[in-house]
């Protein structure tokens, strides 16, 4: 996993400079907790995730194949919890702290005082 994270962050920086085409990673966060390491990533599209995951020249595909070989020998050796959500519209409310999560990646829209509902804010994006 560390090799993939480094590869994606290097590509993100190179794409921001205009040196490479973006693989589609918008942002990522990793945290270590009692269950192990949790990594959350935000991508430009589901198609970008699948393109990266299946590209033989990128770090993910060889690592995934190695994981499957190891899991056949010892299914309890590594646990992967993978969820993909395609989000067309979303809302996150922050009262006080700086935006984080999806709002940090996609930007935040200030909540109006009156007459603006969550539905209106999502449609306006």
Language model: regions and residue ranges:
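Short catalytic/ligand-binding loop motif for oxyanion handling, primarily in non-cytosolic enzymes
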Residues: 37-38, 49-51, 91
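Tryptophan-centric aromatic hotspots in well-structured domains and transmembrane helices
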Residues: 42-44
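Long, compositionally biased terminal regions
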Residues: 59-66, 84, 89-91, 96-125
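Short, glycine- and small/hydrophobic-rich beta-strand elements in well-ordered beta-sheets
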Residues: 2-38, 72-77, 82, 108-124
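An amphipathic, aromatic/His-enriched active-site/gating alpha helix that lines ligand/cofactor pockets
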Residues: 33, 46-79
């Amino acid at each position: 996993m560390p090799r993939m994270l480094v590869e994606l962050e290097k590509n993100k920086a190179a794409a921001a400079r205009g040196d490479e085409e973006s693989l589609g990673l918008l942002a990522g966060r990793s945290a270590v907790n009692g269950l192990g390491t949790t990594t959350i990533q935000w991508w430009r599209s589901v198609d970008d995730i699948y393109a990266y995951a299946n590209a033989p020249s990128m770090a993910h595909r060889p690592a995934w194949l190695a994981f499957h070989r190891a899991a056949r020998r010892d299914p309890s050796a590594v646990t992967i919890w993978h969820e993909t959500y395609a989000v067309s519209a979303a809302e996150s409310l922050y009262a006080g702290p700086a935006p984080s999560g999806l709002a940090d990646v996609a930007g935040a829209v200030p909540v109006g005082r009156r007459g603006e509902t969550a539905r209106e804010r999502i449609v306006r994006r």
